[in-house]
């Protein structure tokens, strides 16, 4: 059993590198499915840690830490794509520490932080490998905003024995140092539904005998 003190110590040791990861990925800021610089940067870090990985799509990555001991198989997931938005060089407190270098694209939804935290988590678990059991999968999902890789990632995990999947999302409304967790849905996510609306034609003078599908669809 790894103590909380040990985990906090490890987290503190990788803090600076996590900040560096976040700033680098923030500057890259690439649209879903085209996160080429981000993909290269993450893969180089995974290789530095000596972990095997699979390119699930051109830019989505699934890395594996196998402790060699029986135990749960856990997947940890982070998204890595940015949004097609122009970034303001200033925030409410003053100039930003770093801004996107890609015109018209920026990390406005925190995916740079998600990826950086998962990279830090990966480093911590590699350092503590001898004290762990089971298998940990690190999922770097490309194109969360446009669905560029979620089906392929699910398929890749489906070909493995996975007991549980964990993911996080930054949330500015929470006080620093706290996390929010709840049963059921917590935030909106990428997805869609199809509906078919059946209208009924009629004369403009007798709308009461018609069914206007525009109102229903709206």
Where are these regions (language model features)?
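Histidine/acidic-residue-rich, glycine-tolerant segments that coordinate divalent metal ions
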Residues: 83-85, 96-106, 112-113, 128-218
């Amino acid at each position: 059993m790894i103590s909380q003190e040990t985990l906090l110590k490890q987290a503190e040791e990788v803090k600076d590198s996590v900040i560096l990861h976040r700033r680098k990925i923030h500057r890259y800021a690439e649209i879903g499915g085209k996160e080429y610089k981000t993909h290269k940067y993450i893969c180089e870090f995974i290789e530095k840690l000596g972990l095997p990985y699979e390119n699930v799509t051109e830019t989505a990555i699934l890395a594996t830490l196998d402790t060699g001991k029986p135990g749960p198989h856990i997947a940890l997931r982070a998204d890595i794509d940015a949004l097609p938005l122009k970034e303001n060089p200033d925030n409410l407190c003053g100039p930003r520490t770093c801004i996107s270098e890609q015109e018209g694209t920026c990390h406005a939804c925190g995916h740079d932080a998600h990826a950086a935290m998962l990279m830090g988590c990966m480093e911590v678990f590699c350092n503590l490998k001898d004290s762990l059991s089971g298998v940990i999968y690190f999922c770097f999902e490309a194109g969360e905003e446009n669905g560029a890789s979620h089906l392929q990632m699910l398929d890749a995990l489906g070909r493995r024995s996975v007991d549980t999947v964990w993911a996080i999302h930054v949330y500015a409304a929470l006080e620093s140092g706290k996390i929010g967790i709840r049963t059921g849905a917590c935030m909106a996510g990428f997805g869609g539904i199809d509906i078919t609306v059946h209208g009924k034609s009629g004369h403009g003078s007798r709308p009461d005998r018609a069914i206007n599908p525009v109102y229903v669809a709206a």
